Amino acid sequence: MASLQANATSSLQYQTAPLESSHIPGSPHSVHVLLEGYSKDVGGDLFQADGSVTLIQGPLTVLVDTAGPWSRDSLLQSLQNQGVAPADVTHVICTHGHSDHVGNLNLFSHAEILVSYDLWRNGYYVAHDFRAGVPYVLPGGEGLEVVATPGHTGSDISLLVPGTSLGTVVVAGDLFEREGDGDSWQPLSEDPERQEDSRAAILKVADVIIPGHGPPFRVIKHGQLAQQETKNN
């Protein structure tokens, strides 16, 4: 990720497009959005929100974010619908420590747990230098990689999932609120400048982004756009 960040400020031409399905098959990894995040202005100073929850299945069974505690029953039912019990989950990755992303961690106490830059394995804290831009490669994960994407908070992380039918999927938490979020994410950001750099870095490598509070979307780069136009002509 360090090399990505070094090039993050260079221009990138791309388009986004909605993804029609919450399931992305692939080998060695498939991705399923169990709960789609949302954020609603309900009037006054009140918002109603919950974070997306994503299941990655392959050599490991990985859950990214756990939603808020108010979504416990929905999360358990969604896992059950996929034939997954909480005890089957090998790794839980929380993109940051806000309550709508970590609210059900207690369901997965046996799993390796990564919350922001803090990694726990078998009840022990394991040091990892995310602040220096060192990615965390999940052992046995066949390319699953956690990278630092600070900005929304000072220690946000994202999971890179290669080997799907649509290419590399990035589960990005609140790095992206939703497709086409424009500048609306900036008031929610602890450090908008760093977040802008993190967003640019992820856009360079992602074919699909799963945001924190909206449906997944495709990222179509300039070269891909040119190829599509050639095919259409």
Swiss-Prot record:
User: Localized where?
Assistant: Cytoplasm, Cytosol; Nucleus
Per its UniProt entry, what is the enzyme's top EC class, as one word? hydrolase
Annotated EC = 3.1.27.-
The entry marks the following residues as binding Zn(2+) 2, namely: 100-101, 174, 213
One GO molecular function term of this record is: metal ion binding
The answer to whether keyword Cytoplasm applies is yes
Q: Which GO biological process categories is it annotated with?
A: histone mRNA metabolic process; positive regulation of G1/S transition of mitotic cell cycle
Cellular component, GO, one term = cytoplasm
Cofactor stoichiometry and binding? Binds 2 Zn(2+) ions per subunit.
* Alphabetical list of InterPro entries matching this protein: MBLAC1 (IPR039344), Metallo-B-lactamas (IPR001279), RibonucZ/Hydroxyglut_hydro (IPR036866)
Q: Where does Zn(2+) 1 bind?
A: 96, 98, 152, 174
Q: Name one Pfam family in it.
A: Lactamase_B
The protein's required cofactor(s) are namely: Zn(2+)
Q: What is its main location?
A: cytoplasm
Reaction(s) catalysed by this chain, per the record, are: a ribonucleotidyl-ribonucleotide-RNA + H2O = a 3'-end ribonucleotide-RNA + a 5'-end 5'-phospho-ribonucleoside-RNA + H(+)
Entry function:
Endoribonuclease that catalyzes the hydrolysis of histone-coding pre-mRNA 3'-end. Involved in histone pre-mRNA processing during the S-phase of the cell cycle, which is required for entering/progressing through S-phase. Cleaves histone pre-mRNA at a major and a minor cleavage site after the 5'-ACCCA-3' and the 5'-ACCCACA-3' sequence, respectively, and located downstream of the stem-loop. May require the presence of the HDE element located at the histone pre-RNA 3'-end to avoid non-specific cleavage.
How are the domains described in the entry?
Contains four of the five characteristic MBL-fold metal-binding motifs, with two waters completing metal coordination.
Quaternary structure and partners: Homodimer.
Query: What family, per the record?
Result: Belongs to the metallo-beta-lactamase superfamily. Glyoxalase II family.
Any idea what this protein is called? Answer: Metallo-beta-lactamase domain-containing protein 1
Q: Which gene encodes it?
A: mblac1
